[in-house]
Regions:
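Active-site recognition of the HExxH zinc-binding catalytic motif
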Residues: 130-144
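Short N-terminal segments immediately surrounding and downstream of signal-peptide cleavage
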Residues: 25-42
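Auxiliary, metal-adjacent structural segments of Zn-dependent hydrolase domains
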Residues: 62-129
């Protein structure tokens, strides 16, 4: 009997820990998987252009699920990769990207912003039209 209670307690703990990670609806999880695949395709082009091995992720916890179901996140996120490609248009830029940029994280925010620390570029944006690529490019050119 005690063994069953321990198993139940462990199972309940596992479910409680796993729920936040899997709290998104099936529709949202499918959309996220598709958008991550789209971002991965774009990342292949960026890495080919730059001769780099940058990794990219979308921090889904920072986006409103209903809003991200209506408006694709990937095109906004791709602005950061476009900015990196622009910087790679010459050898100095390629070398700098390869030496310094290791990851790109796209996150939701009220206003667009870029930050860079320890090889990690974080690009935050809302899902409304704006000049994301320009913001990231200007930021990287001044910060790298």
């Amino acid at each position: 009997m005690r063994s069953n209670r321990q198993i139940f307690t462990l199972a309940a703990l596992f479910v409680a820990v796993a729920l936040p990670a899997h709290g998104a609806s099936l529709e949202a999880r499918k959309m996220q998987a598709q958008q991550e695949a789209d971002l991965s395709d774009k990342l292949v082009l960026t890495n080919k252009t730059c001769g780099s091995h940058v990794k990219a992720t979308i921090d889904w916890s920072t986006f409103n699920e209903a809003e991200s179901l209506k408006t694709a996140v990937t095109p906004f996120c791709a602005a950061a990769l476009d900015a990196i490609e622009d910087i790679c248009s010459d050898e100095i830029g390629k070398q700098t990207i390869n030496e310094k940029v290791k990851t790109v994280t796209c996150a939701g925010a009220a206003a667009p912003a870029a930050s860079f620390a320890d090889g990690a570029l974080t690009f935050s944006f809302s899902l409304t039209p704006n000049q994301n690529k320009l913001l990231v490019r200007d930021y990287l050119e001044k910060s790298l």
